[in-house]
Amino acid sequence: MAGNQQLRVLHALDIARTQLYHFIAIVIAGMGFFTDAYDLFSISLVADLLGHVYYHGELPRNIHAAVTGIALCGTVPGQLVFGWLGDKMGRKRVYGITLLLMVVSSLASGLSFSKHEGMNIIAVLCFFRFWLGVSIGGDYPLSATIMSEYANKRTRGAFIAAVFAMQGFGNLAAGIIGMIVSAAFKHSSASKIDYAWRIILMFGAIPAALTYHWRMKMPETARYTALISKNAKKAAKDMSAVLNVNITPDDEVINELARQDEYGLFSFEFLHRHGLHLLGTTVCWFVLDVTFYSLNIFMKNIFTEVGLLPRLDSEYHHTLQRMITMTAVHTFISLCGALPGYFFTVAFVDRIGRVKIQLIGFTMMTVFMLCLAIPYDQWLRHKNKYGFAVMYGLTFFFANFGPNTTTFIIPAEIFPARLRSTCHGISGAVGKIGAIVGVFGFLYTEYHIRIFLFVLIGCNLVGFIFTLLLPESKGKSLEDLTGEIEEFQEEDEGSEVALSRPIHTVPL
């Protein structure tokens, strides 16, 4: 009975009608992902400029890998540490720290200076980009967990996907800002190019900084307060404010629930209940990030090889022209492929289901990458570079309307509240290890692009197989998925707690 009484307050959250606050939360939580995606692509542009300014041509291969991959190295400890802190200290208490660190690191990256030019400046830049990666990594489990615990069960997938879709806007913004800055400096003296890369890097901090105040005002999620902190009064107060529903708390119910299901991470009971789930989320995220990040980071190498981009030389104006061309191609792929993929996931994830979309995504990525790899010599021989770009864009469409989004959604739903942020952090950290493998493991891709594509196809097939370990979470309450509390057995599934209705009491 206690479980049913407690679940009434969570049931009210599960069936709540979509309100303005949900959309505000999407924007607040999504700004970290805007900066993440902005940084991912903009650093590829910046690498060309750094090569021209400090190496009079192209960055050495090892330095290029360090500049582009060091932030990914920072995301691994960021996800593990902040994911764990999110469960131990509360989602809100550490949420502002990640955003503040993100803003400071972005600005400091653009302000990197040294007494001696060249390698010293690169070292300073890498230092601040590592901490930028830590902040971005910490934002993953916290944003996903907060959005999953705020949302109703009917549209929960769409809300989490919408937060993640801010990556698409960050990706697009990187291309647009890159084109604007490149065009602005095109007719300036060569010495002023040093300002261009700094402006590009620092711009990503602006949207995140604008949402810091609102992030600090967000209340702790009711699920954390009720199920982990066992503070029924505060949970009732916070939920009343969010849903415009008056809730009467009962501390005795919370105390009784506090003694239920207290198994720890990696205990026998956890492995029995969720071991295969964690294996599925980690492996799928790992192989997805090997593919997704390597295709992003090495896009310019691949496009140069097929003739879409001019090759680098020591001429200043050629460097900027290459940047303009690169950003134009990337913006085209974002608008026609990547961004629509995010939108399709938001629209269909609560209709089709997370697992089906992930399976479809891995399958179609494999198909289009086979279309790139098998006739690769034909793409080169016939100079069909625009057809190659279309196939490349379709690969990104099904990555985003597929595992790139669903690997972010699923870990935020299928683990118990007291371990949710930690497990999401573990899944994401393993994923980012895959991203590091993708960046540092394919340093010579321009010489073996066909082999590179076939390796990524193998990663897609592994992801498809391990997706079969994951449960479908569409339309289910978080507590039903995790088994924390017995399923609430009322017949009013179709009822809604609406913002416009009079305030009433839901017993706790």
From Swiss-Prot:
Cytoplasmic topological intervals: 1-22, 86-93, 139-159, 214-277, 350-354, 411-424, 472-508
InterPro entries attached to this UniProt entry: MFS_dom (IPR020846), MFS_sugar_transport-like (IPR005828), MFS_trans_sf (IPR036259)
Membrane-protein topology: Multi-pass membrane protein
Keywords annotated in UniProt: Membrane, Phosphate transport, Symport, Transmembrane, Transmembrane helix, Transport
A single Gene Ontology CC term: membrane
Topological domain ranges for the Extracellular compartment: 44-64, 115-117, 181-192, 299-328, 376-389, 446-450
Parts of the chain that traverse the membrane: 23-43, 65-85, 94-114, 118-138, 160-180, 193-213, 278-298, 329-349, 355-375, 390-410, 425-445, 451-471
Highest taxon in the source lineage: Eukaryota
Primary location class: membrane
GO molecular function terms listed in the Swiss-Prot or TrEMBL record: symporter activity
GO biological process terms held by the UniProt record: phosphate ion transport
Location within or outside the cell: Membrane
Matching CDD domains: MFS_PhT
Family: Belongs to the major facilitator superfamily. Phosphate:H(+) symporter (TC 2.A.1.9) family.
Note in the entry: Although related to the sugar transporter family, it does not transport sugars.
Task of the protein: High-affinity transporter for external inorganic phosphate.
Protein's name according to its UniProt entry: Putative inorganic phosphate transporter 1-13
Organism listed in the record: Oryza sativa subsp. japonica
Lineage: Eukaryota, Viridiplantae, Streptophyta, Embryophyta, Tracheophyta
